[in-house]
Each structure stands twice: as structure tokens, then as C-alpha cells.
Design a protein with these regions (language model features):
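Single-residue signature of alpha-solenoid repeat helices
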Residues: 1-2, 39, 79, 140
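Amphipathic alpha-helical segments of tetratricopeptide repeats
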Residues: 3-11, 45-51, 87-88, 149
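Residue-level recognition of tetratricopeptide repeat
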Residues: 9, 76, 120, 153-154
Length: 166
């Protein structure tokens, strides 16, 4: 309950996105333990999250979690539609040549990090997630490793590589 904002504040809608990777892993664990209904409820909750500009800035790979959740729920056509959307978004990211980090450079990045390097790391990570969603783990790990070399703070890239090793 501590993670839930009071409805009267009309805020916190996007904070749920930050919990998606953990909820997804929990759903997978529940499914492995035979708790199918609980797992399906979590996958449905992930799929029910709308995608908007704010959510995509908080968790750009939300669509990838939704793709895999949709597949696990048996909704292949919808998963395929989201997969194509993600691939299109990554293609746009690869073409970005602006002077800042996707047209807006937060002040701390402009003093600390090379925007082109950050953009490249973000793009590599989104490619990794796209391959993961498509079930192509070798390609996913290659892009995750590339992203991690450019930005060592990408903790979920590290988790992906560690999980692939085990």
C-alpha cells in the first residue's frame, strides 16, 4: 500500500511502469510454480497499461513486456502488432541525429555524458528488448552487452545477461 498514491492526488499513474519488470518476473515465477491464474492476472495488468509519451520516457521497453505477456496469454496477433510498432520506434531511434538526448538534453547529461553515446546505448537496449520479445536471446544478449558497455548503469541489461548465463 505504501506504493499506492491516494486517488485524490491524481498522480502516480506512471510510477506503475517502474514496477513492470519486477511484476513480469514475478508472473513468470508464479507460472513456473503452477500459480497460473495469478501469473495471468499480472500479465493482464501489464497489458492493460496504456502507452503514452510519459510512460515511454519512464519505461521505453514497456511495449516489449506487453508483447511477451500477450503471447503468454495467447494473443499472438496483438503481440505481433506491438512488435512491429516497437521495431518502427527503434528504427526511428537509429536515425536520430539531434544535438541532445532525443531533442531535450537534461542539464545533468549535458555536463556529464556524451548525448550521442547515451542515444546509442538507449537504442541498443531497445533493440535488445525487441529481440527478447521476439524470443531471439542471442541477438538480445549481443545488443544488451553493447548497451551495457556504453552505459554501465543499465541494470536490466545486466540482469538479462546474467539470466542468459544461468
Amino acid at each position: 500500500q505504501a506504493l499506492c498514491y491516494p486517488e485524490s492526488l491524481n498522480t502516480g499513474a506512471w510510477n506503475g511502469a517502474l514496477q513492470v519488470p519486477v511484476q513480469f518476473k514475478l508472473a513468470d515465477t508464479l507460472a513456473m510454480l503452477g500459480e497460473t491464474k495469478e501469473a495471468e492476472n499480472l500479465w493482464r495488468a501489464i497489458c492493460a497499461m496504456g502507452q503514452d509519451a510519459i510512460l515511454e520516457s519512464v519505461l521505453p521497453e514497456l511495449g516489449c513486456y506487453q508483447i511477451v505477456a500477450l503471447r503468454r496469454l495467447g494473443h499472438e496477433a496483438e503481440a505481433e502488432r506491438l512488435q512491429k510498432r516497437h521495431e518502427s520506434r527503434v528504427a526511428q531511434m537509429q536515425l536520430a541525429r539531434d544535438s541532445g538526448y532525443y531533442q531535450a538534453t537534461p542539464f545533468f547529461i549535458s555536463y556529464c555524458e556524451d548525448a550521442a553515446l547515451q542515444r546509442s546505448a538507449a537504442t541498443s537496449w531497445q533493440q535488445a528488448m525487441g529481440y527478447w520479445a521476439a524470443g531471439k536471446m542471442n541477438e538480445a544478449c549481443a545488443h544488451a552487452l553493447h548497451a551495457l558497455k556504453q552505459d554501465p548503469t543499465l541494470q536490466y541489461a545486466r540482469f538479462m545477461l546474467e539470466e542468459a548465463e544461468s
